[in-house]
Amino acid sequence: MNARAESLPTVASDLISLTKPRLSSLVLVTAAGGMWLAPGHMGAVNALVTLLATAGTVGAANALNCYWERHSDQFMDRTRNRPLPSGRMEPAVALWFGISLAAVSLPALALGANVLTAALGLVALLSYVLAYTPLKARTSAAMLVGGVPGALPPLMGWTAVTNQMDVGGFSLFAIMFLWQMPHFIAIALFRKEEYRAAGLTSVPLERGDESSRAQVVLYLVALIPMTLLPFQLHIAGAWYLAAAVLLGLSFLGLGAWGFFRRLGNTWARQTFFFSLIYLTGLFAALALDRVPRE
């Protein structure tokens, strides 16, 4: 009995780790940002239920992803100690945990927000688990497919308030979609050999480092004008515009430096970490300089 009681915290910790809390928290911030920026009002209880249900949906997708990738995770330093590849948890537990979490979270999204937001959550879940995850072992285009569920949370936050998809919500979706590309290419560059050992493909493995660095620059060139849309749509004000331009040019400068100097893993890690600073700064500026709604 005592041994069983002592194991409960470990089991709980392992279940939580399946949801990838750090990734889920980042997604939750973007969903909350979409809710804050959307025109209209939402009650505090409904907003809380919506955010918790969004977190549950993301956690379910991550848990099912862990189930699917339990074999390849054994070959990567950052994943081999997860509950499934390490052998601490039976695969069936992770599978049913993910399914159960989704079964609770998606109806909660419909109740807390609306059916449209729940439908977007379902699209995010299915595209992440059934499309992006299996494609990772086959083609680098999986990155583009995975960009869709990764970009849906701010749109879900927007539709939770407005109950409609419009250009404002899609501008947030586009920003998140384009931001993910240099972010994930950077990871794939400095973890290239781990990807190879795990049997996964990526832009660097398929196209080479030079093409990968070039794609980072091209995606940043596309991202910068997209970040100006919230100002043009009167979602955010001039201070946001200044922050978006400054952050965008800084990010582009870092990308161009790596491309022209043909830099390697150190630059890729710097690009990865700056991408997190960039996204945090951009959404902070959006939140702080939100144009008041009447």
From Swiss-Prot:
Q: What highest taxon heads this organism's lineage?
A: Bacteria
Question: Which keywords does UniProt give here?
Answer: Cell inner membrane, Cell membrane, Heme biosynthesis, Membrane, Transferase, Transmembrane, Transmembrane helix
Q: Which reaction does it catalyse?
A: heme b + (2E,6E)-farnesyl diphosphate + H2O = Fe(II)-heme o + diphosphate
What parts of the sequence cross the membrane?
25-45, 48-68, 92-112, 115-135, 141-161, 170-190, 216-236, 240-260, 272-292
Annotated membrane topology is:
Multi-pass membrane protein
Annotated signal sequence range: none
> What pathway annotation does it carry?
Porphyrin-containing compound metabolism; heme O biosynthesis; heme O from protoheme: step 1/1
What else the UniProt entry mentions is: Carbon 2 of the heme B porphyrin ring is defined according to the Fischer nomenclature.
Query: Which NCBIfam families does the annotation name?
Result: cyoE_ctaB
Q: What is this protein called?
A: Protoheme IX farnesyltransferase
Q: Which organism is it from?
A: Myxococcus xanthus (strain DK1622)
Lineage of the species this protein comes from: Bacteria, Pseudomonadati, Myxococcota, Myxococcia, Myxococcales
What gene name is listed for this protein? ctaB
